[in-house]
């Protein structure tokens, strides 16, 4: 059996397996255990009581986190006409149509969010096989197909979290950085939970919020007592 490193031994003294922590205690321990030399991301996993095989329970959407995610977000926008200046003024990293399509086809896919105005979808549609598997295909459900490209870019840059339930009905997302204070992280988590409450499918039966866990990029995970969050 491999020996534990000094860091692993330190972390193992802080984690009690099979224990559920209050959200504040869990976040405090995450910060203590975050010993990487970079500002680690704080990720959340929320197990929902849904059946994603049913179309109306295949949850996806977006929410603005009040304290942002701490990530630098690169945004590409497909649009034309007056919207070009609007997207640029809002902070888009690149704006285009056919030229942007060709750039992406050539391998330039270094973007976190791709936004499109409705009149650009004819061009964007040709990139389905490139953007789809990467989760970058614009979609009106998450606000990335819109006539208001300025607002969409601003939202993406200011800390918009796009979420989608995976095959097991689990929502994953980044809710901040280790450098954030505990109250800011807790507020972001509660806002995400509030959003998921709003989009609860009417056909979902039984317990909706089943489990909540949080972890940092290089650290351990902690199970959170659901009574300590706004469910």
From Swiss-Prot:
Cross-referenced Pfam families: Ribosomal_L1
UniProtKB keywords: Repressor, Ribonucleoprotein, Ribosomal protein, RNA-binding, rRNA-binding, Translation regulation, tRNA-binding
Cellular component GO terms, alphabetical: cytosolic large ribosomal subunit
An example Gene Ontology molecular-function term: tRNA binding
InterPro entries according to UniProt: Ribosom_uL1_bac-type, Ribosomal_uL1, Ribosomal_uL1-like, Ribosomal_uL1/biogenesis, Ribosomal_uL1_3-a/b-sand, Ribosomal_uL1_CS
GO biological process annotation, one example: translation
HAMAP family from the UniProt entry: Ribosomal_uL1_B
Subunit text: Part of the 50S ribosomal subunit.
Job of this protein: Binds directly to 23S rRNA. The L1 stalk is quite mobile in the ribosome, and is involved in E site tRNA release. Protein L1 is also a translational repressor protein, it controls the translation of the L11 operon by binding to its mRNA.
Family statement: Belongs to the universal ribosomal protein uL1 family.
Annotated protein name in UniProt: Large ribosomal subunit protein uL1
Protein source organism: Vesicomyosocius okutanii subsp. Calyptogena okutanii (strain HA)
């Amino acid at each position: 059996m491999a020996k534990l490193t000094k860091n692993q031994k330190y972390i193992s003294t802080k984690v009690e397996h099979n224990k559920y922590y209050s959200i504040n205690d869990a976040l405090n321990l995450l910060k203590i255990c975050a010993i990487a030399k970079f500002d680690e991301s704080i990720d959340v996993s929320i197990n929902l009581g849904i059946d994603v095989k049913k179309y109306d329970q295949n949850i996806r959407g977006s929410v603005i986190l009040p304290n942002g995610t701490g990530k630098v977000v690169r945004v590409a926008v497909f649009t034309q006409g007056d919207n070009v200046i609007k997207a640029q003024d809002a902070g888009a990293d690149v704006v285009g149509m056919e030229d942007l399509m060709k750039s992406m086809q050539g391998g330039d896919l270094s973007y976190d969010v791709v936004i499109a105005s409705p009149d650009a979808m004819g061009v964007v549609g040709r990139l389905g096989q490139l953007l789809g598997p990467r989760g970058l295909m614009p979609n009106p459900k998450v606000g990335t197909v819109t006539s208001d490209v300025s607002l969409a870019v601003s939202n993406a840059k200011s800390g918009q979290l796009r979420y989608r339930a995976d095959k097991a009905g689990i929502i994953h997302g980044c809710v901040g950085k280790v450098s954030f204070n505990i109250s800011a992280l807790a507020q972001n988590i509660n806002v995400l939970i509030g959003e998921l409450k709003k989009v609860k499918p009417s056909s979902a039966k039984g317990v909706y919020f089943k489990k909540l866990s949080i972890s940092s990029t290089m650290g351990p995970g902690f199970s959170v007592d659901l009574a300590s969050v706004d469910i």
